[in-house]
């Protein structure tokens, strides 16, 4: 099976990476679909985010990294994905993700969204938290892959 894991990944966290590994273990293949959203101002360019993810996942079998814009279900169809993979940290994530999953099912009945609960030690982790800690000079090596930590620290010098 092939899972599509969409997101902005700005930046990739160890929580994302854990979900990717577990997704590959469960489904065999995970397409990491990095959202290209012209209405947002990301910390890292699309190219940087893709390079960071490729670097962090180079040892994981079954990973493909690519960008997309538009509807997730349309991209899932183009990539011949069987399902959409999402992670849940808290009930607040569930409420939002459930709305998106229902919307995706309304748009295309062929796609189920599979939710994986985040490992407890990553439940506090979000890209926003990582950026805020980095901006104030805090330690982020336990939150993100090494390359991401280095690039974030350089960005917030």
UniProtKB/Swiss-Prot annotation:
GO molecular function: ATP binding; pantetheine-phosphate adenylyltransferase activity
Domain of life, per lineage: Bacteria
Residues binding substrate: 8, 40, 72, 86
Keywords, alphabetical: ATP-binding, Coenzyme A biosynthesis, Cytoplasm, Magnesium, Nucleotide-binding, Nucleotidyltransferase, Transferase
EC id: 2.7.7.3
Family annotation (InterPro entries): Cyt_trans-like (IPR004821), PPAT (IPR001980), Rossmann-like_a/b/a_fold (IPR014729)
GO annotations of cellular component type: cytoplasm
Site (Transition state stabilizer): 16
Catalytic reaction annotation: (R)-4'-phosphopantetheine + ATP + H(+) = 3'-dephospho-CoA + diphosphate
Location within or outside the cell: Cytoplasm
Enzyme class: transferase
Gene Ontology terms describing biological process: coenzyme A biosynthetic process
Binding site for ATP: 8-9, 16, 87-89, 97, 122-128
Any Pfam family matching the protein: CTP_transf_like
Known cofactor(s): Mg(2+)
Pathway membership: Cofactor biosynthesis; coenzyme A biosynthesis; CoA from (R)-pantothenate: step 4/5
Record function comment: Reversibly transfers an adenylyl group from ATP to 4'-phosphopantetheine, yielding dephospho-CoA (dPCoA) and pyrophosphate.
Quaternary structure and interacting proteins, as annotated: Homohexamer.
Family: Belongs to the bacterial CoaD family.
Name recorded for this polypeptide: Phosphopantetheine adenylyltransferase
Lineage: Bacteria, Bacillati, Cyanobacteriota, Cyanophyceae, Synechococcales
């Amino acid at each position: 099976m092939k899972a599509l894991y969409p997101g902005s990944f700005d930046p990739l966290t160890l929580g994302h990476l854990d979900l990717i590994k577990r997704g590959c273990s469960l489904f065999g293949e995970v397409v990491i679909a990095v959202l290209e959203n012209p209405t947002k101002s990301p910390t890292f360019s699309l190219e940087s985010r893709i390079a960071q993810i490729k670097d962090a996942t180079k040892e994981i079998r079954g990973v493909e990294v690519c960008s997309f814009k538009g509807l997730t279900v349309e991209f899932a169809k183009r990539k011949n994905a069987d399902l959409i993979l999402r992670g849940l940290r808290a009930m607040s994530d569930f409420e939002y993700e459930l709305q998106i999953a229902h919307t995706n099912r309304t748009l295309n009945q062929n796609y189920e969204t599979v939710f994986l609960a985040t490992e407890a030690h990553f439940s506090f982790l979000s890209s926003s938290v990582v950026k805020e800690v980095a901006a104030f000079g805090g330690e982020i090596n336990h939150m993100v892959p090494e390359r991401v930590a280095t690039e974030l620290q350089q960005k917030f010098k």
